[in-house]
Design a protein with these regions (language model features):
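Transmembrane alpha-helices and adjacent helix-loop boundaries
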Residues: 1-247
Length: 247
């Protein structure tokens, strides 16, 4: 491994790129940990945003007008404000208020920056997931819905066994695009000092002034991740496509 690293550092040095930090455990280990943190953020937010998006969809399609209105308002606010601003509001305002309230009672705040990144990104993308699913439901043929109702299925059974599976398949392209955007949006974690790959890279280049070399690594890292998500999404679209829908 050391031989490969030395060879890589030497070869890239001829191109004017400084990757000597890879030979220093003090800098290499945090960088590798940052890669892991970024992946952990992405996996966590993908899972949480999918669950939250489904809950928002249920609220939108529910019979309670108040709940539906609140869900619609949340979606509109979330979709129309920047992710970074939402993260700052959550971490610098809401987190501060929680900290003050807990400290007044002699309790430490258990919510770390990682939690706020996952929460904000998950809720942000959940709004887009819910809209994609809503469009999927709107695209369902009326004959299918009428046929399910005529068979005597309950409303819940129709939703979980017929409508949702078909809507998911119709909404897959939009949902996959949301996941790709989520991978890229995870880069905002460094804004509140979460030790992801961006944050660790900043710590390194402030000492070594090798911004270009590290930026190329970051671009390659996120490029590979988005490619993998796109690849998986394309497979799912082919596997579960609805005949006649054209994708």
């Amino acid at each position: 491994m050391d031989t490969l690293l030395h060879g890589f550092v030497t070869a890239t040095a001829r191109l004017g790129l400084d990757y000597r930090f890879l030979l220093d455990d003090y800098e290499r280990v945090p960088f590798v940990q940052g890669l892991g943190v970024s992946i952990e953020i992405i996996v966590s937010t993908m899972t949480a945003s999918a669950v939250a998006g489904l809950l928002l969809l249920l609220a939108l399609r529910g019979r309670n007008r108040l709940v539906c209105g609140l869900a619609r308002g949340f979606i509109e606010v979330t979709r129309n404000t920047p992710t970074l601003v939402q993260l700052y509001c959550a971490f610098l305002v809401l987190n501060m208020l929680i900290t003050q309230w807990l400290h007044a009672r002699g309790i430490d705040n258990p919510f770390k920056p990682f939690f706020w990144v996952v929460l904000v990104l998950s809720l942000h993308k959940a709004a887009f997931h819910a809209e994609a699913l809503r469009a999927g439901f709107d695209a369902l043929p009326s004959q299918t819905l009428e046929g399910a109702a005529s068979l005597g299925f309950s409303r819940a059974t129709r939703f979980w066994r017929i409508e949702l599976p078909l809507a998911l398949r119709a909404a897959l392209p939009a949902l996959v695009n949301n996941m790709v955007e989520l991978v890229k949006a995870s880069a905002v974690a460094s804004a509140i000092a979460v030790g992801d790959v961006n944050y660790q890279s900043i710590m390194i280049w402030t000492q070594r002034d090798n911004v270009l070399a590290l930026m190329l690594l970051i671009l390659a890292f996120f490029g590979v991740l988005t490619w993998l998500v796109t690849l998986a999404g394309s497979w799912l679209e082919r596997r579960y496509r609805i005949p006649g829908y054209g994708y």
